Amino acid sequence: MTDLDRRWDLPSAPEDLLYQAAILSRFFPALAVHLRSSLGGLYLAAGSLAPDEARDFNARMDQDKSVLDLNYYRLLRLTGNLSLAADMDLPQDLPEEDRDIVEETELVCRETESLAKLLGLTLRFRCQEGRHLCALRRDAVRQLLLQLLSNAFKFTPAGGEITVALSSGNGWVHLTVTDNGPGIPPERKEHLFDRYLRADRNHIPPHGLGLGLPICRRIAEGHGGRIMAESQEGRGTRITVMLPDRQTGKLALADQPMDYGGDFNPTLLGLADVLPAEAFQKL
Protein backbone atom coordinates (compact mmCIF):
# COMPACT_ATOMS: atom_id res chain seq x y z
CA MET A 1 0.00 0.00 0.00
CA THR A 2 1.42 3.39 -0.99
CA ASP A 3 1.45 6.42 1.27
CA LEU A 4 -1.26 8.02 -0.88
CA ASP A 5 -3.42 4.91 -0.55
CA ARG A 6 -2.97 4.90 3.19
CA ARG A 7 -4.00 8.55 3.47
CA TRP A 8 -7.35 7.80 1.84
CA ASP A 9 -8.15 4.99 4.26
CA LEU A 10 -10.24 5.57 7.35
CA PRO A 11 -8.04 7.24 10.00
CA SER A 12 -6.30 4.81 12.31
CA ALA A 13 -3.43 6.90 13.65
CA PRO A 14 -2.97 10.48 14.91
CA GLU A 15 -1.04 11.54 11.80
CA ASP A 16 -3.96 10.38 9.64
CA LEU A 17 -6.35 12.53 11.65
CA LEU A 18 -4.10 15.58 11.35
CA TYR A 19 -3.58 15.03 7.64
CA GLN A 20 -7.26 14.77 6.85
CA ALA A 21 -8.12 17.66 9.17
CA ALA A 22 -5.69 19.84 7.21
CA ILE A 23 -7.29 18.84 3.90
CA LEU A 24 -10.84 19.40 5.14
CA SER A 25 -10.11 22.64 6.99
CA ARG A 26 -7.81 24.41 4.54
CA PHE A 27 -7.50 22.84 1.11
CA PHE A 28 -11.14 21.98 0.39
CA PRO A 29 -12.63 25.40 1.25
CA ALA A 30 -9.95 27.17 -0.80
CA LEU A 31 -10.63 24.83 -3.70
CA ALA A 32 -14.36 25.54 -3.39
CA VAL A 33 -13.79 29.30 -3.77
CA HIS A 34 -11.87 28.83 -7.01
CA LEU A 35 -14.34 26.30 -8.38
CA ARG A 36 -17.34 28.50 -7.66
CA SER A 37 -15.74 31.48 -9.39
CA SER A 38 -14.98 29.47 -12.53
CA LEU A 39 -18.35 27.73 -12.54
CA GLY A 40 -20.20 31.03 -12.51
CA GLY A 41 -18.51 32.13 -15.72
CA LEU A 42 -19.13 28.79 -17.40
CA TYR A 43 -22.81 28.84 -16.49
CA LEU A 44 -23.33 32.35 -17.86
CA ALA A 45 -21.55 31.44 -21.09
CA ALA A 46 -23.63 28.28 -21.50
CA GLY A 47 -26.80 30.28 -20.94
CA SER A 48 -25.82 32.62 -23.75
CA LEU A 49 -25.16 29.72 -26.12
CA ALA A 50 -28.40 27.93 -25.23
CA PRO A 51 -30.92 30.53 -23.98
CA ASP A 52 -34.20 29.30 -22.53
CA GLU A 53 -36.29 30.82 -25.31
CA ALA A 54 -34.30 28.87 -27.93
CA ARG A 55 -34.55 25.63 -25.96
CA ASP A 56 -38.34 25.85 -26.19
CA PHE A 57 -38.11 25.16 -29.95
CA ASN A 58 -34.98 23.00 -30.20
CA ALA A 59 -35.16 19.57 -28.57
CA ARG A 60 -31.49 18.75 -29.23
CA MET A 61 -30.33 22.02 -27.69
CA ASP A 62 -32.61 21.39 -24.73
CA GLN A 63 -31.11 17.93 -24.18
CA ASP A 64 -27.54 19.17 -24.49
CA LYS A 65 -28.16 22.08 -22.12
CA SER A 66 -29.83 19.77 -19.59
CA VAL A 67 -26.67 17.62 -19.46
CA LEU A 68 -24.60 20.74 -18.88
CA ASP A 69 -27.00 21.99 -16.20
CA LEU A 70 -26.94 18.63 -14.43
CA ASN A 71 -23.17 18.57 -14.20
CA TYR A 72 -23.03 22.23 -13.27
CA TYR A 73 -25.44 21.65 -10.40
CA ARG A 74 -23.42 18.64 -9.26
CA LEU A 75 -20.25 20.69 -9.12
CA LEU A 76 -22.04 23.56 -7.40
CA ARG A 77 -23.39 21.14 -4.79
CA LEU A 78 -19.89 19.75 -4.27
CA THR A 79 -18.41 23.22 -3.78
CA GLY A 80 -21.07 23.93 -1.16
CA ASN A 81 -20.14 20.79 0.76
CA LEU A 82 -16.43 21.56 0.47
CA SER A 83 -17.04 25.03 1.88
CA LEU A 84 -18.85 23.56 4.89
CA ALA A 85 -16.11 20.99 5.52
CA ALA A 86 -13.84 23.50 7.26
CA ASP A 87 -15.89 24.05 10.40
CA MET A 88 -18.04 20.93 10.75
CA ASP A 89 -16.38 20.03 14.04
CA LEU A 90 -16.72 23.51 15.55
CA PRO A 91 -19.62 23.99 17.99
CA GLN A 92 -22.26 26.25 16.51
CA ASP A 93 -25.84 26.97 17.49
CA LEU A 94 -27.91 27.71 14.41
CA PRO A 95 -30.24 30.73 14.62
CA GLU A 96 -33.79 29.49 14.86
CA GLU A 97 -37.38 30.64 14.66
CA ASP A 98 -40.65 28.84 15.24
CA ARG A 99 -41.85 27.09 12.10
CA ASP A 100 -44.31 24.37 11.23
CA ILE A 101 -41.99 21.41 10.70
CA VAL A 102 -44.86 19.35 9.25
CA GLU A 103 -45.44 21.95 6.54
CA GLU A 104 -41.72 22.34 5.81
CA THR A 105 -41.13 18.59 5.56
CA GLU A 106 -44.22 17.94 3.45
CA LEU A 107 -43.19 20.74 1.08
CA VAL A 108 -39.80 19.14 0.45
CA CYS A 109 -41.49 15.79 -0.16
CA ARG A 110 -43.91 17.34 -2.67
CA GLU A 111 -41.03 19.03 -4.47
CA THR A 112 -39.05 15.80 -4.72
CA GLU A 113 -41.84 13.30 -5.42
CA SER A 114 -41.75 13.77 -9.19
CA LEU A 115 -37.94 13.57 -9.15
CA ALA A 116 -38.14 10.26 -7.31
CA LYS A 117 -40.43 8.96 -10.06
CA LEU A 118 -37.76 9.77 -12.66
CA LEU A 119 -35.58 7.24 -10.83
CA GLY A 120 -38.34 4.66 -10.64
CA LEU A 121 -38.82 5.24 -6.90
CA THR A 122 -41.88 5.87 -4.75
CA LEU A 123 -41.64 8.61 -2.11
CA ARG A 124 -44.16 8.72 0.73
CA PHE A 125 -44.70 11.18 3.59
CA ARG A 126 -46.30 10.04 6.83
CA CYS A 127 -47.32 12.22 9.78
CA GLN A 128 -50.30 12.00 12.10
CA GLU A 129 -50.10 15.67 13.07
CA GLY A 130 -51.50 18.36 10.82
CA ARG A 131 -49.30 21.07 12.30
CA HIS A 132 -46.38 21.19 14.73
CA LEU A 133 -44.45 24.35 15.62
CA CYS A 134 -40.88 23.98 16.78
CA ALA A 135 -37.65 25.98 16.71
CA LEU A 136 -35.62 25.35 13.59
CA ARG A 137 -33.45 26.93 10.93
CA ARG A 138 -35.51 26.44 7.78
CA ASP A 139 -32.75 26.39 5.16
CA ALA A 140 -30.58 24.08 7.26
CA VAL A 141 -33.39 21.58 7.88
CA ARG A 142 -34.26 21.60 4.18
CA GLN A 143 -30.62 20.95 3.34
CA LEU A 144 -30.50 18.10 5.85
CA LEU A 145 -33.66 16.47 4.46
CA LEU A 146 -32.52 16.84 0.85
CA GLN A 147 -29.20 15.23 1.75
CA LEU A 148 -30.94 12.29 3.41
CA LEU A 149 -33.25 11.91 0.42
CA SER A 150 -30.27 12.11 -1.92
CA ASN A 151 -28.61 9.23 -0.09
CA ALA A 152 -31.82 7.18 -0.11
CA PHE A 153 -32.39 7.83 -3.84
CA LYS A 154 -28.77 6.97 -4.59
CA PHE A 155 -28.72 3.57 -2.92
CA THR A 156 -32.29 2.38 -3.50
CA PRO A 157 -32.77 0.47 -6.76
CA ALA A 158 -35.60 1.25 -9.17
CA GLY A 159 -38.89 -0.06 -7.86
CA GLY A 160 -37.92 0.77 -4.29
CA GLU A 161 -39.71 2.93 -1.76
CA ILE A 162 -38.55 5.78 0.49
CA THR A 163 -40.67 6.95 3.41
CA VAL A 164 -40.26 10.26 5.22
CA ALA A 165 -42.01 10.30 8.59
CA LEU A 166 -42.51 12.85 11.37
CA SER A 167 -43.57 12.19 14.95
CA SER A 168 -43.13 13.82 18.34
CA GLY A 169 -42.97 12.73 21.95
CA ASN A 170 -40.97 12.97 25.18
CA GLY A 171 -39.62 16.39 24.27
CA TRP A 172 -38.32 15.45 20.82
CA VAL A 173 -39.41 15.69 17.20
CA HIS A 174 -38.37 12.63 15.21
CA LEU A 175 -37.70 12.98 11.48
CA THR A 176 -36.95 9.66 9.79
CA VAL A 177 -36.02 8.71 6.25
CA THR A 178 -36.39 5.00 5.55
CA ASP A 179 -35.51 3.11 2.38
CA ASN A 180 -35.63 -0.51 1.30
CA GLY A 181 -32.26 -0.46 -0.43
CA PRO A 182 -29.28 -2.77 0.15
CA GLY A 183 -28.47 -1.45 3.63
CA ILE A 184 -25.13 -0.35 5.09
CA PRO A 185 -22.25 -2.79 5.65
CA PRO A 186 -21.48 -3.16 9.39
CA GLU A 187 -17.90 -1.95 8.95
CA ARG A 188 -19.14 1.39 7.57
CA LYS A 189 -21.83 2.14 10.15
CA GLU A 190 -19.31 3.13 12.84
CA HIS A 191 -17.89 5.93 10.69
CA LEU A 192 -21.08 6.95 8.88
CA PHE A 193 -21.27 10.47 10.35
CA ASP A 194 -17.53 11.08 10.79
CA ARG A 195 -15.91 14.03 9.09
CA TYR A 196 -13.35 12.02 7.16
CA LEU A 197 -12.68 11.14 3.56
CA ARG A 198 -14.37 8.02 2.31
CA ALA A 199 -12.51 4.77 2.78
CA ASP A 200 -13.70 3.28 -0.51
CA ARG A 201 -11.53 5.68 -2.47
CA ASN A 202 -11.73 3.64 -5.66
CA HIS A 203 -15.50 4.18 -5.78
CA ILE A 204 -15.76 7.94 -5.26
CA PRO A 205 -17.98 8.43 -8.33
CA PRO A 206 -20.93 8.47 -7.98
CA HIS A 207 -20.96 8.21 -4.20
CA GLY A 208 -18.98 11.39 -3.48
CA LEU A 209 -16.49 12.25 -0.76
CA GLY A 210 -18.70 11.23 2.13
CA LEU A 211 -19.25 14.77 3.46
CA GLY A 212 -23.06 14.76 3.22
CA LEU A 213 -23.90 12.80 6.37
CA PRO A 214 -21.33 14.65 8.52
CA ILE A 215 -23.02 17.86 7.36
CA CYS A 216 -26.37 16.38 8.44
CA ARG A 217 -24.86 15.60 11.83
CA ARG A 218 -23.63 19.18 12.09
CA ILE A 219 -27.10 20.54 11.30
CA ALA A 220 -28.79 18.24 13.82
CA GLU A 221 -26.31 19.12 16.55
CA GLY A 222 -26.61 22.82 15.68
CA HIS A 223 -30.27 22.51 16.68
CA GLY A 224 -29.34 20.75 19.91
CA GLY A 225 -30.34 17.40 18.42
CA ARG A 226 -28.69 14.25 17.16
CA ILE A 227 -28.74 11.82 14.25
CA MET A 228 -28.49 8.04 14.15
CA ALA A 229 -28.71 5.17 11.67
CA GLU A 230 -30.31 1.74 11.75
CA SER A 231 -29.56 -0.64 8.92
CA GLN A 232 -29.55 -4.29 7.95
CA GLU A 233 -27.79 -5.50 4.86
CA GLY A 234 -30.34 -6.47 2.26
CA ARG A 235 -33.24 -4.88 4.18
CA GLY A 236 -32.69 -1.14 3.96
CA THR A 237 -31.70 1.80 6.12
CA ARG A 238 -33.46 4.19 8.47
CA ILE A 239 -31.87 7.52 9.40
CA THR A 240 -33.45 9.26 12.39
CA VAL A 241 -32.93 12.92 13.23
CA MET A 242 -34.05 13.99 16.71
CA LEU A 243 -34.69 17.71 17.22
CA PRO A 244 -35.66 19.31 20.54
CA ASP A 245 -39.41 19.90 20.67
CA ARG A 246 -39.25 23.49 21.86
CA GLN A 247 -40.20 26.97 20.71
CA THR A 248 -38.33 30.27 20.77
CA GLY A 249 -41.35 32.58 20.71
CA LYS A 250 -40.06 34.06 17.43
CA LEU A 251 -42.57 33.25 14.71
CA ALA A 252 -41.50 33.26 11.07
CA LEU A 253 -43.54 35.99 9.37
CA ALA A 254 -42.11 35.48 5.89
CA ASP A 255 -39.80 33.05 4.18
CA GLN A 256 -36.21 34.23 4.06
CA PRO A 257 -34.17 33.80 0.89
CA MET A 258 -32.13 30.62 0.94
CA ASP A 259 -28.40 31.10 0.43
CA TYR A 260 -27.35 27.47 -0.10
CA GLY A 261 -27.36 27.79 -3.89
CA GLY A 262 -27.84 31.46 -4.67
CA ASP A 263 -30.65 31.91 -7.21
CA PHE A 264 -30.63 28.27 -8.29
CA ASN A 265 -33.36 25.74 -7.67
CA PRO A 266 -32.49 24.41 -4.18
CA THR A 267 -34.34 21.13 -4.69
CA LEU A 268 -32.52 20.27 -7.92
CA LEU A 269 -29.29 21.41 -6.31
CA GLY A 270 -29.76 19.21 -3.27
CA LEU A 271 -30.47 16.11 -5.38
CA ALA A 272 -28.19 16.84 -8.34
CA ASP A 273 -25.78 14.00 -7.63
CA VAL A 274 -28.51 11.38 -8.17
CA LEU A 275 -30.77 12.95 -10.82
CA PRO A 276 -30.77 12.18 -14.54
CA ALA A 277 -30.34 14.98 -17.07
CA GLU A 278 -34.06 14.64 -17.84
CA ALA A 279 -34.81 16.52 -14.61
CA PHE A 280 -33.26 19.66 -16.15
CA GLN A 281 -35.02 19.57 -19.51
CA LYS A 282 -37.54 22.22 -20.47
CA LEU A 283 -39.35 20.22 -23.16
Model feature map: region roles:
Residues 184-196:
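Short conserved segment of the HATPase_c
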